[in-house]
Amino acid sequence: MKYFTHILLFLVLLLTGCGDKEKLSGKVVFSDGQPLTTGTIYFTNNNYTARAHLRENGTYDVGSLSERDGLPAGTYKVYISGAIENNADPTDETMRLLIAPEFASESKTPLTITVPGERVYNITVERPQPVKKPPR
């Protein structure tokens, strides 16, 4: 009986932490309207982190433990990881960031969202500034 009580108490505590979650989806595009076709978008605050993989058309559905399971109420920083492109030369291992660096940094991102709120959160990001090569 004691074992059953412990299991029941554990389940109650576990389910208490599972509040209502809001379904959230959207699209990530550049300022020219072209979709960002690769990367993972993160929604994070002090208590919770959720992610979604971008599809080739730039759309996403938010999940924490699995895709599309939503976000609990709160304000979140939004940033994108893995938005990189391999160099066309297969012998060159360098990669190029497809978005401006501030959108790829949890500490520098200008993007935030408050949940509950809009259930569709479309995001516009900027491309990185071209790197100026020093004169020869």
Stretches found by the model and what they are:
Residues 1-16:
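Sec-dependent bacterial lipoprotein signal peptides
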Residues 18-136:
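Beta-strand-dominated extracellular/periplasmic modules and repeats
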